[in-house]
Curated annotation (Swiss-Prot):
Residues 1-234 are annotated as: Alpha N-terminal domain (alpha-NTD). Keywords: DNA-directed RNA polymerase, Nucleotidyltransferase, Transcription, Transferase. This is DNA-directed RNA polymerase subunit alpha. The gene is rpoA. Belongs to the RNA polymerase alpha chain family.
Length: 338
């Protein structure tokens, strides 16, 4: 009976993805139906993980020729070093190699220096190449070396400064998170005849190094991994293997026809109209799928759950290789055992 704690809760049937204007960076993701209260619980947890716990890449320090500290200015460069650093913080990177790595910019004026002027190396890609870093006047020369690394969340400039940092190396605050903005909304929704469910909508914006769908998938995986320590029991057996000598890979009860169950006429007709013939067909259905059956409501659902519970079964079970090719022959063979 322990499985009832989670098996009888309704679960979302699919994740609907609505791409934004830039599908690689923006999307709205909708999950429904959820049990009442789960929209807020999951929405808040996923938002916090998305904003703080995903791996990304960022510039962690810069060294500019003839510059000793961040309050300096560079001859022929309109921006001062502080403004250049602020612009470097907004450079978006995709990094497929272990850091730290060194990149460089070498430019001559007159010119508008952008992220696209960063000399890329294998395994590192600049995503927002049009992003402006600074402006050079005629005759100006600019050479800078950038240190890039991977990490998560926010790391202060102080922590990004190496112990053996050379004179002129300026550490930069690093915001590693590839997710730039997340918001969520919870609205009531219906499933079949039941109105008391949640619909969770997440709007996710990324820097382009990861798609919103993948970002949400990674966040859910992190949450799943963190919660695993709290599960202190083994999963109960599914509707699989029973006796060694019956020749079956599943419980023979699954071969029993649903019209032999003591169900109300309404419930029986709903199953018939949905082409559910055997108990094996029935138990693989989820609550959400059942509630989408025409004229099938919560009363019928509870009736079926009670009948299945008395047989040691429940909705949402997994049966491998169902239905067997010779299902009618097997049903007749085991008919007397019912």
């Amino acid at each position: 009976m322990i499985h009832k704690n989670w098996a009888e809760l309704i679960k979302p049937t699919q994740l609907e993805v609505k791409p934004g204007n830039d599908p690689a960076r923006q999307a709205t993701l909708v999950a429904e139906p959820l049990e009442r209260g789960f929209g807020l619980t999951l929405g808040n947890a996923l938002r916090r993980i998305l904003m703080s716990s995903l791996q990304g890449a960022a510039i962690t320090s810069v060294q500019i020729d003839n510059v000793l500290h961040e309050f300096s200015s560079v001859a022929g460069v309109r921006e001062d070093v502080t403004d250049i650093i602020l612009n470097l913080k907004q450079v978006s990177l995709r990094m497929e190699v272990e850091g730290p790595k060194r990149l460089s910019i070498n430019a001559k004026g007159p010119a508008v220096v952008t992220a696209g002027d960063i000399a890329e190396t294998a395994g590192i890609e600049v995503l927002n190449r049009e992003h402006v870093i600074c402006h050079l006047d005629d005759g100006a020369d600019l050479f800078m070396e950038l240190t890039v690394n991977t990490g998560k969340g926010y790391v202060s400039a102080e922590k990004n400064k190496p112990e053996d940092a050379p004179i002129g190396l300026i550490p930069i605050d690093a915001i590693y998170s590839p997710v730039k903005k997340v918001s969520y909304d919870v609205q009531p929704t219906r499933e079949g005849q039941v109105l008391d469910y949640d619909k969770l909508t997440l709007k996710v914006d990324t820097d382009g190094s990861i798609t919103p769908e993948d970002a949400l998938a990674f966040a859910a995986r992190i949450l799943q991994d963190q919660l695993s320590i709290f599960v202190n029991f083994d999963e109960p057996e599914s509707a699989g293997r029973q006796d060694e000598d019956d020749g079956l890979e599943f419980n023979p009860l699954l071969l029993k026809k649903v019209d032999e169950l003591e169900l109300s006429v309404r419930s029986a007709n709903c199953l018939k109209n949905d082409n559910i013939v055997y108990i094996g067909d029935l138990i693989q259905k989820t609550e959400a799928e059942m509630l989408r059956t025409p004229n099938f409501g919560r009363k019928s659902l509870n009736e079926i759950k009670e009948v299945l519970s008395g047989m040691g079964l429940h909705l949402g079970m997994d049966v491998e290789d169902w239905p067997p090719d010779n299902i009618e022959e097997l049903a007749k063979k085991f008919e007397d055992s019912f």
